């Protein structure tokens, strides 16, 4: 007798072993038709999986997140099937699920063209309509390797040969195609109804640039056409908001091959940067942080003591001078500990909060670089809090309050918080980890926020809180972190004199709110589609005259606003006013002031707000007050 407990708490009993599909059918024909897989005691399995003992079972359908993953994984295999059908000489490699879709890497003698993608997608649709059953068989490693060698699939054979000889291998087949996979997969290809191939890109075999370059075909798959249409619309909007395109259009920055992963900031882009930095500087100063500056280049011995030289060496830029090795800092923390160590610290000095807009460099691979979002040279709004164990909860509460307030000011109202918990390999005792994790939970609870816990995702030296902001398109970006560190203070000899005159290690909290300034500016640009709020806008106001006779008034008006701290310019060119308005509208300037003879004579201005909103004619002082109220919260 096999007892199966369902998610609603009910128990079904069967006199003999049953498959997931048979359980679904016994519940009802609708569920049998909808079933894509199952979850047996939390493990995702195929509908063909046999249940021969008492278990908890959930039937997975396309209404479940796991169901969508199964669909996407199966669609990746359908893609490989179609490619092999159309291009038999192509070699298949790997095809995983990724955010919003999947990809599959192929080795082929020539580049796939857009026309090829159309043919492949059409063939996928034809194969899906055949509704061919998907079967699974388990074989030995050697049998699987021999099979793929026999059909000339050298990459698959290489993958299999890297698996321990004692492991069994799952092979999935539909029609004339067989692939290696952990699964699970849909029961038949007819379940794959909504998909689209997106693009082709280059990729290296096993992610190593020394290996052969492959062709990676990206695709997306969904349960409903409306969902796919919404996703494709979001991609169109994302393309319009692409910070690289807007950076060029708005003359904010550029990048070039002579300095890969580094940014050339133009005047307007640097003005935007300064608004963010000065705002952040004011907020951390108000929160009791002390701003410091640490060297960009430090001796190898310090990085060895911190552990970075041993564990992070490949990502560090290094140099040598006078027979000494140095590293250009990839992070600020060791330098901050040096400042803490410079002098005897008492418990009365704590908490000590050191902040730095620290310039860091990391040797990211050239293929990973992406505009402002992934760079080699960047500045962090970094800070480290040195405190006692009794203080770390209150410090965590204060940081969370500050971070959430900052995100709100920048226009991000939707923030997801994640708490990464202890990994298997870790420093410190279970008792220390219990206190650290519970302390962060208590801090988040006190702040009235909800969070998701990620078991095993913490660093080996402590648990971490992550802040993921959602932009206008619903995309999630991890920006802020609060990382408890139980290792670095000991490695670098940080200590303070406790109340009983003993020497103790401080608790060290690594924290950042925006993270990389470059990346955060890229997120900001895309979130606001380049139309920055007035307090952030590189140029807040442009004053335009209609004719030469108003030039002097327009110039004096701009000078008056400039003295009030407004970022303003006067456009006195001998051009049609409609031309000037259009040009500055494309520059996304928040306020355009137009002056003609009437405005000059009455000492007024005609005001147009961004978006073509006509605010009418008003006295100069009235406009100044409007602008002041627009920006005062943030300045």
From Swiss-Prot:
Sequence positions that bind Zn(2+): 333, 384, 510
Domain TGS: 1-61
Its EC number(s): 6.1.1.3
GO-annotated cellular components: cytosol
Highest taxon listed in the record's lineage: Bacteria
Keywords, alphabetical: Aminoacyl-tRNA synthetase, ATP-binding, Cytoplasm, Ligase, Metal-binding, Nucleotide-binding, Protein biosynthesis, RNA-binding, tRNA-binding, Zinc
Catalytic activity, as annotated: tRNA(Thr) + L-threonine + ATP = L-threonyl-tRNA(Thr) + AMP + diphosphate + H(+)
Gene3D superfamilies: 3.10.20.30, 3.30.54.20, Anticodon-binding domain, Bira Bifunctional Protein, Domain 2, Threonyl-trna Synthetase, Chain A, domain 2
UniProt cofactor(s): Zn(2+)
Keyword Transferase in annotation: no
Region of interest (Catalytic), residue spans: 242-533
GO molecular function: ATP binding; metal ion binding; threonine-tRNA ligase activity; tRNA binding
GO biological process assignments: threonyl-tRNA aminoacylation
Compartments in which it is found: Cytoplasm
Cofactor comment text: Binds 1 zinc ion per subunit.
Subunit structure: Homodimer.
Function: Catalyzes the attachment of threonine to tRNA(Thr) in a two-step reaction: L-threonine is first activated by ATP to form Thr-AMP and then transferred to the acceptor end of tRNA(Thr). Also edits incorrectly charged L-seryl-tRNA(Thr).
PANTHER family: THREONINE--TRNA LIGASE, CHLOROPLASTIC_MITOCHONDRIAL 2 (PTHR11451:SF44), THREONINE-TRNA LIGASE (PTHR11451)
Family statement: Belongs to the class-II aminoacyl-tRNA synthetase family.
Name by which UniProt lists this protein: Threonine--tRNA ligase
GN (gene name): thrS
């Amino acid at each position: 007798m096999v007892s199966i407990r369902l998610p609603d708490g009910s128990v079904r009993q069967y006199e003999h072993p049953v498959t997931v599909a048979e359980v679904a059918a016994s519940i009802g024909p609708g569920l049998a038709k909808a079933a894509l897989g199952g979850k047996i005691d939390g493990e995702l399995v195929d509908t063909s999986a046999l249940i021969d003992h008492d278990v908890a079972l959930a039937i997975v359908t396309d209404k479940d997140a796991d169901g969508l993953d199964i669909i996407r994984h199966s669609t990746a295999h359908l893609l490989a099937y179609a490619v092999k059908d159309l291009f038999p000489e192509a070699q298949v490699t790997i095809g995983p699920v990724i955010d919003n879709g999947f990809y599959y890497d192929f080795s082929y003698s020539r580049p796939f063209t857009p026309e090829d993608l159309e043919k492949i997608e059409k063939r996928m649709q034809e194969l899906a309509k055949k509704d061919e059953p998907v079967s699974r068989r388990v074989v030995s490693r050697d049998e699987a390797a021999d099979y793929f060698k026999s059909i000339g699939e050298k990459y698959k054979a290489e993958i299999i040969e890297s698996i321990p000889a004692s492991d069994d291998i799952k092979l999935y087949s539909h029609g004339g195609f067989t692939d290696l996979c952990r699964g699970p997969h849909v029961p038949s290809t007819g379940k794959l109804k909504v998909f689209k191939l997106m693009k082709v890109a280059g990729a290296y075999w096993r992610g190593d640039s020394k290996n052969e370059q492959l062709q990676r075909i990206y695709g997306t798959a969904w349960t409903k056409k409306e969902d796919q249409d919404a996703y494709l619309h979001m991609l169109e909007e994302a393309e319009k908001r692409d910070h690289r395109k807007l950076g060029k259009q708005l003359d904010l920055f550029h990048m070039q091959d002579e300095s890969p992963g580094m940014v050339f900031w133009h005047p307007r882009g640097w003005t935007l940067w300064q608004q963010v930095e000065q705002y952040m500087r004011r907020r951390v100063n108000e929160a009791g942080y002390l701003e410091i500056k640490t060297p960009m280049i430090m001796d190898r011995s310090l990085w060895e003591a911190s552990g970075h030289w041993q564990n992070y060496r490949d990502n560090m830029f290094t140099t040598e001078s006078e027979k000494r090795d140095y590293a250009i800092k990839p992070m600020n923390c060791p330098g901050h500990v040096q400042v803490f160590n410079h002098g005897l610290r008492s418990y009365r000095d704590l908490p000590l909060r050191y902040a730095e807009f620290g310039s860091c460099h990391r040797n990211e691979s050239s293929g990973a670089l992406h505009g402002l979002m992934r760079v080699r040279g960047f500045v962090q709004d970094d800070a480290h809090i040195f405190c006692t164990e009794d203080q770390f909860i209150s410090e965590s509460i204060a940081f969370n309050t500050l971070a959430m307030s900052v995100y709100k000011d920048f226009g991000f109202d939707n923030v997801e918080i994640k708490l990464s918990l202890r990994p298997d390999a870790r420093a410190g005792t279970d008792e220390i980890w219990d206190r650290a994790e519970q302390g962060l939970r208590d801090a988040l609870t006190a702040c009235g926020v909800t969070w998701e816990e990620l078991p095993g995702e913490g660093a080996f030296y402590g648990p971490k809180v992550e802040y993921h902001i959602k932009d206008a398109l619903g995309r999630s970006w991890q920006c802020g972190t609060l990382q408890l560190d139980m290792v670095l203070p000991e490695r670098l000899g940080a200590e303070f004199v406790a109340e009983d005159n003993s020497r103790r290690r401080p608790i060290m909290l690594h924290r950042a709110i925006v993270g990389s300034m470059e990346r955060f500016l890229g997120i900001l640009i895309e979130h606001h589609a380049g139309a920055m709020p007035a307090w952030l806008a590189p140029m807040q106001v442009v004053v335009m005259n209609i004719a030469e006779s108003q030039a002097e008034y327009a110039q004096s008006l701009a000078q008056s606003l400039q003295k009030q701290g407004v970022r303003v310019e006067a456009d006195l060119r001998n051009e049609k006013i409609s031309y000037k308005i259009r040009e500055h509208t494309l520059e996304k300037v928040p306020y355009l002031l137009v002056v003609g003879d009437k405005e000059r004579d009455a000492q007024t201005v005609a005001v147009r707000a961004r978006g073509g909103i006509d605010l009418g004619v008003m006295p100069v002082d009235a406009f100044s007050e409007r602008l002041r109220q627009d920006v005062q919260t943030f300045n």
